Regions:
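Conserved active-site segment immediately N-terminal to the catalytic lysine
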Residues: 170-204
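Conserved core segment of the aminotransferase class I/II
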Residues: 198-218
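Conserved PLP-binding active-site segment in aminotransferase class I/II-type PLP enzymes
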Residues: 4-75, 79-84, 88, 109, ...
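PLP-dependent aminotransferase-like
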Residues: 83-172, 179
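Conserved small/polar residues in nucleotide/adenosyl-binding loops
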Residues: 1-5, 215-222
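Conserved SAM-binding loop
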Residues: 70, 95, 210
């Protein structure tokens, strides 16, 4: 970075987003002994400890989705979302070329073909007009990324998806708290994916959440 005709030669100071509240919360988990609720008995609260379940409930309530499923990373949440959409060999999934590799790697994981669609020069998100140019009879889903916290034109993307019976997976890793026409990001598609990675807006070191508003998709995901 140039400052008054000089070039900065030292790195910017490293920030620390871990405060007293976070430290207390971790200590409480260690003290209450509920490090896992994997007890070998099936129930609706089989996965995760009480605080994970609390996170899922509060996340779903805040972002106005039916279900929130906590995972170890947003990458895993993307993979689960593609699986819930029943993406498989011979399918095509439309993705943006301007994204993290996980958006494409998940498609390859299921033996499907990623098809790149151009971005909107104003938002750098998927262009609905460009999506229509790459549609084919094999198209199964669309992965739309809310790049830098800015959502794509979801009205138009939903119109295309409904016309062709496609699942929309919204990668909202960079966009918790954003809104599109009054609606929260992460709840704009059929499945939304959030990241809790250390470099994201809300973090726990590592983690991810899949937000689902369609019950039949959650059944596949879990």
């Amino acid at each position: 970075m140039c400052i008054r005709d000089s070039v900065r030669t030292t790195p910017f100071p490293r920030y620390n987003s871990i405060g007293i509240e976070e430290k207390r919360a971790v200590i409480e988990v260690l003290q209450d002994g509920y490090l896992s609720q994997f007890l070998g008995t099936w129930s609706k609260e089989f996965h995760g400890g009480p605080r994970v379940l609390k996170l899922e409930r509060e996340w779903a309530e805040y972002f106005e989705v039916n279900h929130a499923v906590a995972m170890n990373s947003a990458t895993s949440a993307l993979y689960a979302a593609l699986g819930a959409a029943k993406v498989g060999p011979a399918d095509e999934v439309i993705v943006t070329p301007y994204t993290m590799t996980a958006s494409v790697a998940g498609v390859l994981l299921y033996g499907a073909t990623p098809v790149f669609s151009d971005i909107d020069p104003e938002t750098y998100c998927l262009s609905a007009r460009a999506i229509e140019k790459v549609l084919s009879p094999r198209t199964k889903a669309i992965v739309a990324v809310d790049l830098f916290g800015h959502p794509a034109d979801f009205d138009e993307i939903f119109r295309i998806a409904q016309a062709h019976n496609l699942t929309i997976i919204e990668d909202a890793a960079q966009a918790p708290g954003g809104k599109y026409k009054g609606a929260w990001t992460g709840g704009l598609g059929h499945i939304g994916v959030f990241s809790l990675n250390y470099h994201k807006t809300i973090h726990c070191g590592e983690g991810g959440i899949a937000a689902v508003s369609y019950t039949h998709l959650r059944a596949h995901e879990t």
